[in-house]
Regions:
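Short, acidic, metal-binding catalytic loop of nucleotide-sugar glycosyltransferases
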Residues: 38-47
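Non-catalytic, C-terminal membrane-associated alpha-helical segments of glycosyltransferases
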Residues: 221, 236-299
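Short aromatic/hydrophobic "clamp" motif used to bind/position activated sugar donors
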Residues: 98
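N-proximal low-complexity "stem/linker" segments adjacent to membrane-targeting elements
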Residues: 1-39
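Glycine-rich, basic loop-to-helix element that forms the pyrophosphate-binding segment
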Residues: 76-93
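A conserved acidic beta->alpha catalytic loop
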Residues: 39, 54-63, 105-106
Length: 299
């Protein structure tokens, strides 16, 4: 580990090493999934278990079982969505930590898990830890530097403390199948006085494969769920300003990226569910939301 990260390089994991479950939800990505699995098993940290949940694949993913017999394989015959699948992997874990890795994401070195767990063991109120995500649209590595607070982690590469999840709750379902679930969970963790930190330069590569991705559908869902997130968690009277600002921001982005149709459809999906979301509102404390916004601006 680089000497530029004394807060990490000086740490020692306790003799009784915590168990880490690396959870991978997959659907119809049999060609790229092995790279994610291999990168998890290549980690230097000794107490890693790898669990793969096949969410209704029909591309031969199940044939990989014989190649990776050490994996804890589970399969759903019909797809229930990645959010329910991730919740299942976290709820059924007997591990101390859950590491979320996408089926098209992988580690670049061999020490990422060891560094993450050492840091979280040394900082017992850190409930979630974000890796530094690289992707085809952000390919350049950064030097490893001191961990720092952040607003949220991304689903393709992060670690969460199982005890914090059991206290604050798992992913909350939304009308859309994609978007804002990590933001919602991180906000609730912060409201429960857990912290979210980031490891700059400790990278996970997210390949963002186009297989099983529908850009318009993801945008529609993402717009809806972002508005649901605001309605569900934003305290009064701030919600009266946040919702219109978010809608205008989504419209401007959609106009620039030629996604106006799915954006408007996302508004419609949100409006159809707005009453039920309002009735189940559970906003966080004002100071929590203000801190979340401050960290988001600094990210």
């Amino acid at each position: 580990m680089s000497e530029s990260i004394p807060s990490l390089s000086a740490l020692k994991v306790a003799n009784s090493k915590p168990v880490v479950r690396v959870g991978i939800v997959t659907r119809n990505r049999a060609r790229i999934l092995p790279k994610a699995i291999q990168s998890a098993f290549s980690q230097s940290y000794p107490n890693v278990e790898v669990a793969v949940l096949d969410d209704g694949s029909d591309d031969g993913t199940s044939t990989l079982r014989s190649d990776f017999s050490a994996v804890q394989w589970q399969r759903w015959e019909s797809s229930r969505g990645y959010l329910e699948a991730r919740n299942h992997l976290m709820r059924t874990a007997s591990a101390d930590y859950y590491l979320s890795l996408d089926d098209d994401a992988w580690f670049l070195e061999g020490d990422e898990v060891a560094l993450a767990i050492a840091y979280m063991e040394h900082h017992p109120r850190v409930g979630g830890l974000a890796f530094d995500i690289l992707s085809p649209d952000r390919p350049n590595r950064a030097a490893r530097s001191a961990p720092r607070p952040t607003s949220m982690f991304i689903g393709c590469g992060h670690v969460v403390r199982i005890s914090a999840l059991r206290e604050c709750g798992f992913y909350a379902p939304s009308p859309g199948l994609y978007g804002s679930e990590e933001k919602d969970l991180c906000l609730r963790l912060l409201d429960g006085r857990w912290d979210i930190h980031r490891l700059p330069g400790v990278h996970v590569w997210h390949d963002k494969t186009s297989v099983a991705r529908d850009q318009a559908d993801q945008h529609r869902s993402g717009v809806c769920n972002d508005l649901v997130f605001a309605l569900r968690r934003c305290p009064l009277p701030l919600i009266l300003a946040i919702l219109p600002v978010k809608m205008m921001s989504h419209l401007r982005f959609a106009a620039r990226t030629h996604l106006l149709k799915p954006c408007v459809e996302g508004f419609g999906l949100f409006l159809r569910h707005a009453l039920s979301v309002w009735q189940s509102r559970n906003p966080v404390r004002r100071e929590t939301f203000a801190e979340f916004l401050r960290r988001s601006r600094e990210a």
